[in-house]
A protein has these predicted regions:
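Glycine-rich beta-strand-centered segment in the early N-terminal region that forms part
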Residues: 27-42, 55-109
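Proline/serine/threonine-rich low-complexity linkers at boundaries of modular beta-sandwich domains
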Residues: 12-15
């Protein structure tokens, strides 16, 4: 098992958006899978929508040095994100890197 870091975004029912850099356990690859060490990722508009949503970026404050920030979602916009209340969602779905390990049948990758 490998430990990695992942950016996550969560909005509370109270309208507080939290962006965190969390440590996550990454399992060893199964048959036919590879584990990639990500070295570069783009930030797409869809990533920004999930990352920041309708939060007021001028309200940004650091909560934990280097790993957590918070912003307020304006009252008039909070209903637009009700479906994601209290879900700590991973941000981003693209990346480039090198194969770190491979499962059975994927060694050639």
């Amino acid at each position: 098992m490998t430990v990695s870091k992942q950016i996550k975004s969560k909005i509370s029912k109270e309208g507080l958006l939290t962006i965190s850099l969390d440590e996550v356990n990454v399992p060893d690859p199964d048959d036919g899978e590879v584990l990639i060490k990500v070295q570069a990722t783009p930030i797409n508009p869809s990533d920004l929508g999930l990352l920041v949503g309708p939060a007021d970026v001028s309200s940004l404050k650091e909560v934990e040095k280097g790993s957590v920030v918070e912003m307020k979602v304006p009252d008039g916009l909070i209903r637009s994100v009700a479906a994601r209340f209290d879900q700590n969602l991973p941000v981003g779905n693209e990346g480039a890197g090198i194969v770190e390990s491979a499962g059975k049948g994927a060694e050639h990758l």
